Amino acid sequence: MKLVTTTNDFAAYTSNSIEAIEYVKNAGFKYIDYSFCIDYKNKTGIYSADEDYIEKVIDKVRELDVCLVQAHAPFYSFIFDGDISGLIEDTIKCVRACAKWGIPSVVVHAGYQRNISKEENFRKNKEFLLPILEAGVQYGVKILTENFNKMEFDDIYWIDNATDLMEFIEFVNHPNLYVLWDAGHANLQEMSQEEELTKLGDLVLGLHIHDNYGDFDNHMPPFWGTMSMDSLMQGLFAIGYKGYFTFESENIFLSQEHRRINANDSRLLKAPLELRIKAESLLYEIGKTILKTYDCFEE
């Protein structure tokens, strides 16, 4: 299994995803998950006016000798209470970019809305996903949907477990829809990673690996929290998982948004970039140790 991490690890340090690719490479990762969240938030990258951006990424990937192997569509507010055509088109832009970069799959979150039933949620999400799924077929890119984190509001339903994921995929009934298993989100539910993965079987084409204490979606590295890595690894072996081991553990250092602010000086509001890259190197070593322990590490 090959180790991957996301460009979003460096979202606090750059609005330029090409720079983020360099930082990830400098930390030791060869395989990279391209986060369109950086582009969308800053109106850079594929959402900018730069007509040469796609080629610039291709050139940088070739120069650094890295591989873009997975992607994540922007995490919009995803509240289905208005016109969603713009969200659909913005996501299809990601699909087109993935095709040009040779990325085989992109993760697209399901949406939600207050005070609607599970059945209505499924219907609205199918309406949202179908044109994206068809674009994926056209461009040769698989669409992955993931289990979301534990819902804390009684008036909102969203898909946060394997059983509901299976039910949703059967409801959408499209051959280009697959699953990304988010292990950190599952840990919030106190569920068995192995049992949940076994329910999904060969529908699982991707992973998000991160940890937490079971009470908040912290997105910390493995061993920072309470997740059972053994249960996860046993589950991956049980389903014959052949994909990448992809980190989404950007909070090696707590995000600056959660840190108390000193009005007089903010030089250490976030860790210096050089230190953050060193921490990213530790993330690589953590992943390498996990995979070597289970005799499945691939360079």
Regions found by a protein language model. Name each.
Residues 9-11, 36-38, 74-77, 110-114, ...:
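Active-site-proximal loop/turn and secondary-structure-junction residues that shape catalytic pockets
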Residues 139-172:
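Basic- and aromatic-lined ligand-binding clefts that recognize polyanionic substrates
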